[in-house]
């Protein structure tokens, strides 16, 4: 029997979630390539794996079913149709070059599924090529250059796709370093036995198409309940994508209101969830310096089919969100400490917590001031180590792709 997928709130009971263990892709990071791969620093992978397993154990202890991206990709690659579909899109003349594509594709069609999934996530350097070639592309590369790039940002499973109520988006991502992640996940959703017969709609996105300026990432998207969706517009998610997502949700009757939040285009606030996350039905934690400066816009179905009505909001974001949820106001816990500590704890994902159920969140132990304020507000904060994981600029919210979450 197929599972019924859907994420119907930000804090309802979390039932099933997808994560990705730190592995080969993160071990490919170097001081010379980490910025190109969207990391600020290299990571001690062994320690990051320990921290990540502690994070997974914390969720499992509270009854969450945790599935792993790499394992699901391996299981998907055991299906020949799925393997061919994905390799046709990952290994071709445009991606690896004339003279290499056919031979490499043929080789990868035959290898063990686990080895293949390792390559699809961890990359393949010229030195690791399993076939001989005199192709133009391979000829000009050094042994350390990548034929297939590593995808270290797969650890942030939140971004690649996002479940909005009973459907999902397959996100066209902002930077080249992340765009292939969506192709991998699309293969899982299309062919894996857990998903292929589940019958869920795709609201937006298609790895077969270019979406131009319409880019989106899941860290900006929050189905908050009451048929409302919160979407950040900043460094990664554009107004072009927000309009298309809203139009699709309205056309299907899934949402009645999308609140678009204009963010500064800065690294520290690359996604909405780096400065704003829910901890309880009526409680959010925010980095006030950014959130109080957000311009909010309410999108609703237009008078004519297929149109969207857009209106600027004059109230602060927290009041707009409270109104959308039918609440008199939200309780707000700001990043803790003085100005120096607040900036540090926001940078270290103090406001990027993931709720396991109403009033219970997981966050990094290093954010002592913010965690203390949350506890004083009645939130149970389960802390996990993040000395290495935090170097990637993502906390519990970023590292989880909720697949099944209850409504409130």
Curated annotation (Swiss-Prot):
Its main location: cytoplasm. This is Arginine deiminase. Keywords: Arginine metabolism, Cytoplasm, Hydrolase. It is found in: Cytoplasm. Its EC number is 3.5.3.6. Pfam families: ADI (PF02274). One of its GO terms (cellular component) is cytoplasm. The active site is at 398 (amidino-cysteine intermediate). It comes from Chelativorans sp. (strain BNC1). Belongs to the arginine deiminase family. HAMAP family: Arg_deiminase. It catalyses: L-arginine + H2O = L-citrulline + NH4(+). Pathway: Amino-acid degradation; L-arginine degradation via ADI pathway; carbamoyl phosphate from L-arginine: step 1/2. The lineage of its organism: Bacteria, Pseudomonadati, Pseudomonadota, Alphaproteobacteria, Hyphomicrobiales. GO terms for molecular function: arginine deiminase activity. One of its GO terms (biological process) is arginine catabolic process to ornithine.
């Amino acid at each position: 029997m197929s599972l019924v997928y859907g994420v119907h709130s930000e804090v309802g009971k979390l039932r099933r979630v997808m994560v990705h263990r730190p592995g080969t892709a993160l071990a490919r990071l170097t001081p010379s390539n980490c910025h190109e791969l969207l990391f600020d620093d290299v990571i001690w992978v062994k320690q990051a794996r320990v921290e990540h397993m502690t994070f997974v154990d914390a969720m499992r202890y509270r009854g969450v079913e945790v599935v792993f991206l790499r394992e699901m990709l391996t299981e998907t690659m055991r299906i020949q149709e799925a393997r061919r579909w994905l390799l046709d899109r990952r290994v071709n003349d445009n991606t690896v070059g004339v003279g290499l594509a056919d031979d490499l594709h043929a080789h990868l069609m035959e290898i063990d599924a686990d080895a293949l999934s390792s390559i699809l996530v961890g990359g393949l350097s010229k030195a690791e090529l399993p076939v001989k070639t005199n192709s133009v592309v391979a000829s000009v590369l050094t042994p350390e250059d990548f034929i297939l790039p590593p995808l270290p940002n797969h650890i942030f499973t939140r971004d690649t796709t996002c479940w909005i109520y009973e459907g999902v988006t397959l996100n066209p991502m902002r930077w080249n370093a992340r765009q292939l992640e969506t192709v991998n996940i699309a293969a899982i959703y299309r062919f894996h036995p857990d998903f292929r017969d589940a019958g869920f709609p795709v609201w937006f996105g298609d790895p077969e198409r270019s979406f131009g300026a319409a880019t989106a990432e899941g860290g900006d998207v929050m189905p908050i309940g009451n048929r409302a969706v919160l979407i950040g517009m900043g460094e990664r998610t554009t107004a072009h994508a927000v309009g298309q997502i809203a139009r699709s949700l309205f056309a299907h009757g899934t949402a009645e209101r999308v609140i678009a939040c204009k963010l500064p285009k800065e690294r520290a606030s690359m996604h909405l969830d780096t400065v704003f996350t829910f901890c309880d039905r009526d409680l959010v934690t925010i980095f006030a310096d950014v959130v109080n400066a957000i311009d909010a816009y309410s999108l609703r179905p237009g008078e004519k089919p297929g149109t969207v009505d857009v209106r600027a909001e004059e109230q602060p974001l927290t009041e707009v969100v409270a109104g959308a949820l039918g609440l008199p106001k939200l309780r707000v816990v700001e990043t803790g400490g003085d100005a120096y500590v607040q900036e540090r704890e926001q940078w270290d994902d103090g406001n990027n917590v993931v709720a396991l159920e109403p009033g219970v969140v997981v966050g990094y132990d290093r954010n002592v001031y913010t965690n203390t304020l949350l506890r004083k507000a009645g939130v149970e904060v389960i802390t996990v180590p993040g000395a290495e994981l935090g170097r990637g600029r993502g906390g519990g919210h970023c590292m989880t792709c909720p697949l099944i979450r209850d409504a409130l």
